[in-house]
């Protein structure tokens, strides 16, 4: 991957998360916490499995905060290309499983998962097809994959993207939400739901997207 993300450190993640504690440490924003709750609700709505019996993988896990929202799952695993992020996540939650890895490559975990979280990660891939194939290979038949990322669908979202996301040089893949959906469907996934911020009602947000943030719920075929 470009921009030496493997060696991204404290400064990069401080900018990435957009909020810091009183001690100057990166932390989640209120919006991120709201989004995480929405992701949990999406899993409960669309999955055939209970959270307590589900194996969960977060690709591009960063410091592992998203997995906090899925506490109570059978297993919680995270993978990130940045050694720093994996170290912080493992120290923060030693009862979980974190490994360093690149989404362009096969999953470093031998097991398969009932839920895979790909939150703000696809836009960092120089080869998104390889990333989606890696996700598919890590997913059990019938698994749910939740995808969230910035996209460009029209002149308005292109302008918003330039104001909200251009500052991150690691955003190298800038598709429309429709393109992302087609890539997943071409790799054997069924689209159960997709929308743009504010995400409700979903069908209205797709008629004319007013924000780059795209959320999709995919299901791996059997």
What positions do the PLM features span?
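Short N-terminal helix/helix-N-cap motif within the alpha/beta-hydrolase-1
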Residues: 68, 126-130, 157
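Short, glycine-/aromatic-enriched active-site segment of Class I SAM-dependent methyltransferases
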Residues: 150-171
């Amino acid at each position: 991957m470009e921009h030496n993300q493997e060696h991204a450190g404290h400064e990069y993640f401080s900018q990435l998360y957009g909020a810091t504690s009183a001690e100057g440490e990166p932390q989640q924003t209120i919006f991120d916490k709201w989004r995480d709750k929405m992701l949990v609700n999406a899993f409960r709505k669309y999955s055939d499995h209970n959270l307590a019996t589900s194996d969960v993988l977060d690709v591009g896990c960063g410091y592992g905060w998203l997995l906090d929202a899925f506490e109570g799952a059978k297993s919680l695993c995270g993978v990130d290309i940045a050694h720093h992020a994996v170290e912080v996540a493992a120290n923060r939650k030693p009862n979980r499983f974190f490994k360093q890895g690149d989404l362009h490559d096969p999953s470093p975990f031998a097991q398969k998962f009932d839920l895979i979280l790909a939150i703000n990660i696809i836009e960092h891939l120089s080869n998104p097809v390889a990333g989606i194939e890696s996700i598919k290979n890590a997913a059990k038949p019938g698994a749910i994959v939740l995808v969230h990322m910035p996209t460009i669908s029209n002149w308005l979202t292109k302008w918003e993207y330039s104001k909200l996301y251009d500052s991150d040089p690691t955003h190298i893949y800038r598709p429309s939400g429709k393109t992302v959906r087609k890539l997943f469907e071409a790799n054997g996934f069924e689209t159960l739901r997709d929308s743009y911020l504010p995400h409700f009602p979903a069908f209205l947000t797709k008629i004319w997207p007013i924000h780059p943030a795209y959320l999709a719920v995919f299901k791996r075929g059997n």
